[in-house]
From Swiss-Prot:
Responsible for the release of ribosomes from messenger RNA at the termination of protein biosynthesis. May increase the efficiency of translation by recycling ribosomes from one round of translation to another. This is Ribosome-recycling factor. The gene is frr. PANTHER family: MITOCHONDRIAL RIBOSOME RECYCLING FACTOR PSEUDO 1, RIBOSOME RECYCLING FACTOR. GO terms for biological process: cytoplasmic translational termination. NCBIfam families: frr.
């Protein structure tokens, strides 16, 4: 059975792009986004769990997040988790609701976040190139085993390269859009 599997390569490359998009949603841009709190985990009942399993997060205003905690006894741990998440947010406790004003980003912080977005994009590019290398290696293996001919290998290598180029362009587009959003240009 041939080692080359185009569908697997596509799935893995798509996974790298999705991982990048997930990483980028966690970067604060100065506007309220419910995704901003996705990386926050809360210690409740002796276990760590994502914030969205203990509360409902909404963005009632462009510069305000609201976190409605389901169990009153968990308000303290949720407040602590948000403050210690490294997002620079300071919740205001109002009963079972935490109101989180989104502060303006300083120019220096914007540049740091843009640089971080670039690092995430480079990590995704490396992942895509690693998938490409795996695909090329499996094609060479198939040719050595005699399962495909040289012409077939070259044609499929061209397919893999086109897939790689398209995926890298998706990565670049996602990173450029996030950098533009962060820098406010």
């Amino acid at each position: 059975m041939p080692a080359y599997d185009k569908a697997d390569l596509e799935r893995r490359m798509h996974g790298a792009v999705e991982a990048l998009k997930s990483d980028l949603t966690g970067l604060r841009t100065g506007r309220a986004s419910v995704n901003l709190l996705d990386p926050v985990t809360v210690e409740i009942y002796g276990a760590h769990m994502p914030l969205n399993q203990a509360a409902t997060v909404t963005a009632p205003e462009p510069r305000m997040l609201s976190v409605q905690v389901w169990d009153r006894s968990n308000v303290g741990p949720v407040d602590k988790a948000i403050r210690s998440a490294g997002l620079g947010l300071n919740p205001i406790v109002d009963g079972q609701t935490l109101r989180i004003p989104i502060p303006d980003l300083t120019e220096e912080r914007r540049k740091e976040l843009a640089k971080l977005a670039s690092q995430y994009a480079e990590k995704a590019r490396v992942a895509v190139r690693n998938v490409r290398r795996d695909g090329m290696d499996s094609l060479k293996t198939d040719e050595k085993k005699g399962e495909i001919g040289e012409d077939d290998r070259k044609r499929r290598e061209t397919e893999v390269q086109k897939l790689t180029d398209a995926t890298i362009s998706d990565v670049d587009a996602a990173a450029a859009a996030k950098e533009k959003e962060i820098l406010g240009k």
